[in-house]
Structures are given as structure tokens and as C-alpha cells.
From Swiss-Prot:
Catalytic activity, as annotated: (6R)-5,10-methylene-5,6,7,8-tetrahydrofolate + NADP(+) = (6R)-5,10-methenyltetrahydrofolate + NADPH; (6R)-5,10-methenyltetrahydrofolate + H2O = (6R)-10-formyltetrahydrofolate + H(+)
GO molecular function: methenyltetrahydrofolate cyclohydrolase activity; methylenetetrahydrofolate dehydrogenase (NADP+) activity
EC number per UniProt: 1.5.1.5, 3.5.4.9
Protein name: Bifunctional protein FolD
InterPro entries (alphabetical): Aminoacid_DH-like_N_sf, NAD(P)-bd_dom_sf, THF_DH/CycHdrlase, THF_DH/CycHdrlase_cat_dom, THF_DH/CycHdrlase_NAD-bd_dom
Pathway: One-carbon metabolism; tetrahydrofolate interconversion
Pfam name, any one: THF_DHG_CYH
Single GO cellular component term: cytosol
Organism: Acidothermus cellulolyticus (strain ATCC 43068 / DSM 8971 / 11B)
Family from the record: Belongs to the tetrahydrofolate dehydrogenase/cyclohydrolase family.
Keywords, in A-Z order: Amino-acid biosynthesis, Histidine biosynthesis, Hydrolase, Methionine biosynthesis, Multifunctional enzyme, NADP, One-carbon metabolism, Oxidoreductase, Purine biosynthesis
Free-text function comment from the UniProt entry: Catalyzes the oxidation of 5,10-methylenetetrahydrofolate to 5,10-methenyltetrahydrofolate and then the hydrolysis of 5,10-methenyltetrahydrofolate to 10-formyltetrahydrofolate.
Gene Ontology biological process terms from the UniProt entry: L-histidine biosynthetic process; methionine biosynthetic process; purine nucleotide biosynthetic process; tetrahydrofolate interconversion
The protein's assembly and partners: Homodimer.
Length: 293
């Protein structure tokens, strides 16, 4: 019997339907949420990802505000766009598509954002609020992982969780989320300096692979019945010479795990859904609506 597939596409569709209703209530009060995107450069993957975000906006009734700059844009030019969106009342929240082209200071750009308009939850102020367990926009991918586990009723309280990867967008932030009292998991963060990764993974009830190493998590190191979430994505060249994207989890893990969020179709759609959730929640806060349960 194989793993239960954690279908991020299906869950994300449910979330978008829920958000559509909430946006309708906001519109009834004269509030139109708006998502801004700042895209610098001509990376095809970034352009495709941003286009997907705006398609999602159209589905739920959120206005789109697009700002695109060439790869040659200076730090000052990017800063000017940030200042514009900070001041624009039509922009409820916005994201800066990362990575930025070489030569631009990503941290300086993120720090310049209005924390209240940080739709990605990556502003230093909002990450600090997460550390302090205070309300605020949450990083989208970690929030998507957590919501996917909840919707499939995967036990989290008291679970031993291994997160492979210590990047701020997934690994470190996810550990902070899962150790809140509302989740009460015990989290081990593994990385390139971890000795005997397999030993850590074997005892985990939940494994989140976000290292960017294809096939890193193999069936022999997964506890039978564990939940495994594949967040890794790496561009590789196949035997046929064509490029494709692959995750961190070996396909055969589905024969051992109890639950599996595959790549693609698992966490990715949830990340986009959580971005819109952050925008809608920001609009509700601004309108004085009670916090959603």
C-alpha cells in the first residue's frame, strides 16, 4: 500500500475558493485587495512564476499591480519601485521576485519594504515577529507545508520533524512555525554540516526536504508511515539532453511513506495559495475585519 498523496493542487483550489468568498465580502465593504509584484531581469522561470501569481489573483478577484525592470536596473531604480508600492494605497501587499540579478543587494531591498505590505513574510521585521510568536504575515512556503499537513490531518503535535535545508525561505522559518505552541512539534534542522543525515531522517515522523539535492531522501532512510514533503527543486539535464526539474525525494519513497507531498504538485501550489492568503488577511486587517480562524 503506497503513501497517501498530499495533493497540493486540490487543496490550493479549495483555498482559492475560500479566498474568493472573503474577497467578495471585502469588495462589499468597498475594499479591493491588490497584489504587487516586482520582477527584475529576464529569467524565464521567474517570469512564469510571477505570471502564475497574477492568474491566481484573477481567479479570486484580487487586483494585480505589476512592476518589471530590466536586468540592468540599478539599486536606486529598484528602490524607487519599492517606495512607489509602499505609498500606493491600491497595493495591499507585494513581493519582490527572488533571486535578484547579480549586483543588487537583496537584503537592502527587502528591508526597504513596508513590513505591513510584505506578502512573502520575509521582511526582517516579520521574521522577527515569527521568532517572538507575534501575529504577522508568514513565509509562504513554510505556511503552505503546514497547511497541507493540517488539511490531510497528519499528526503534528509531539511529532519528530526533520527539516533538511536551512535557507530562510523554508528551513529556518518552518522550524519556527512548527515549534509554536499551536503545533508543538520537535524540529531538527539538518544541513550540509550534519553528520549522519540518514540517522536523523530514520527517526522522523515528518520529513521536509528542501536542500536542492536531487534524490537526497531515499526509501531506505525513511521511517515506514512517515510524512514526507518534497520542497526541493533542481534543474537537471536528462539522458535525452533535455532540461527538467526534479525534487529532493526519490520516487520510490512513496512505497514506504504514509503521506507524500510530491514535486511537482505538492507544496508548490500551496506556496502560491498562501501568498494570496497573506494579501487577503492584510486587506481584512486594514478593513478592521476580525481575524480568520
Amino acid at each position: 500500500m503506497g503513501a497517501v498523496i498530499l495533493d497540493g493542487r486540490a487543496v490550493a483550489a479549495d483555498i482559492l475558493a475560500e479566498l474568493t468568498e472573503r474577497v467578495g465580502r471585502l469588495r462589499g465593504q468597498g475594499v479591493l485587495p491588490g497584489l504587487g509584484t516586482v520582477l527584475v531581469g529576464d529569467d524565464p522561470a521567474s517570469h512564469a512564476y510571477v505570471a502564475g501569481k497574477h492568474r491566481d489573483c484573477a481567479k479570486v478577484g484580487i487586483a494585480s499591480i505589476e512592476r518589471t525592470l530590466p536586468a540592468s536596473a540599478s539599486q536606486a531604480e529598484v528602490a524607487a519601485v519599492i517606495d512607489e508600492l509602499n505609498a500606493d494605497p491600491a497595493c495591499t501587499g507585494y513581493i519582490v521576485q527572488l533571486p535578484l540579478p547579480a549586483g543588487l543587494d537583496e537584503v537592502a531591498v527587502l528591508e526597504r519594504m513596508d513590513p505591513a505590505k510584505d506578502a512573502d513574510g520575509l521582511h526582517p521585521v516579520n521574521l522577527g515577529r515569527l521568532v517572538l510568536m507575534r501575529p504577522g504575515p508568514l513565509p509562504c512556503t513554510p505556511r503552505g507545508c503546514l497547511e497541507l499537513l493540517r488539511r490531510y490531518e497528519v499528526p503534528i503535535a509531539g511529532a519528530d520533524v526533520v527539516v533538511i535545508g536551512r535557507g530562510i525561505t523554508v528551513g529556518r522559518a518552518l522550524g519556527l512555525l512548527l515549534t509554536r505552541r499551536s503545533e508543538n512539534a520537535t524540529v531538527t534542522t539538518c544541513h550540509t554540516g550534519t553528520k549522519d543525515l540518514a540517522a536523523h531522517v530514520r527517526r522522523a515522523d515528518i520529513v521536509v526536504a528542501a536542500a536542492g539535492v536531487p534524490g537526497l531522501v531515499t526509501p531506505d532512510i525513511v521511517k515506514p508511515g512517515a510524512a514526507v514533503l518534497d520542497v526541493g527543486i533542481t534543474r537537471v539535464i536528462g539522458d535525452d539532453g533535455r532540461a527538467r526539474y526534479t525534487g529532493d525525494v526519490h520516487p520510490d519513497v512513496r512505497e514506504v511513506a504514509g503521506w507524500l507531498a510530491p514535486m511537482p504538485g505538492g507544496v508548490g501550489p500551496m506556496t502560491r495559495a498562501m501568498l494570496l492568503a497573506n494579501v487577503v488577511e492584510a486587506a481584512e486587517r486594514q478593513a478592521g475585519f476580525p481575524a480568520a480562524s
